Amino acid sequence: MAIKVFADGANLEGMLDMYENGNVQGFTTNPSLMKKGGVTDYRAFAKEVLAHITDVSVSFEVFADDVEAMEVEAREIATWADNVYVKIPCVTTKGESTAELVRKLSADGIKVNVTTIFTPEQVDEMVEAVDTETPSIISLFAGRIADTGVDPIPFMTESVKKAAIKPNCEVLWASTRELINIYQAEACGCQIITVPNSILAKRKNIGRDPYEVSLDTVRGFAKDIAALGFHILP
């Protein structure tokens, strides 16, 4: 497949295992993953990750919620390593756009990963903001859009077309829910998809005969029935 698979991660051991096995082509992190992974020192964790992972991109997110403080944090994060992308949410919690900050950072040669994008208007704004020469990523939360009952495929496909005017801007399918999303993302033209470990583990099922899957499922039910000791007839 042409699409690059990135892993969501905040566990160093797991990240290094995937990196060393060549299972992924990049990594992303976010505050929620840090909390779940028990990270207590953001800078120390990032520096340790970057000491081992040097030749694929790793995205680290700013923590501030106002544009001025975001800029200070972003410029600091950008100094950590050449393969770092700075994750910038497209809006603050107050709904203030970060497009001008993205424009400034990108123009200064800082690689940004603009995240939490959900609408066509946000895509338009951020594609316009990123620099033509500086590599950038726009992360579109296809899975969370699907969670609202809306098919994300048309939005993703149209967004890829919009981003094509900036040759160094890559579109990332975020919040992946199923293995088939990898194929859907590639069909839409996305250059990157982030995939959680639970779904990466399912790649071993690719190409399996559906009949064999059916048998395995029935055998699993039978095993659970035996373990429960249930009976219908006396």
Predicted regions and their residues:
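Active-site beta->alpha loop and helix N-cap motifs at the rims of alpha/beta catalytic domains
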Residues: 2-16, 20-24, 28-108, 142-145
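Flexible domain-boundary/linker segments
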Residues: 35, 44, 122, 202-203
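Catalytic alpha/beta core domains of metabolic enzymes, predominantly
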Residues: 96, 103, 110-201, 207-229
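C-terminal extensions of enzymes
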Residues: 232-234
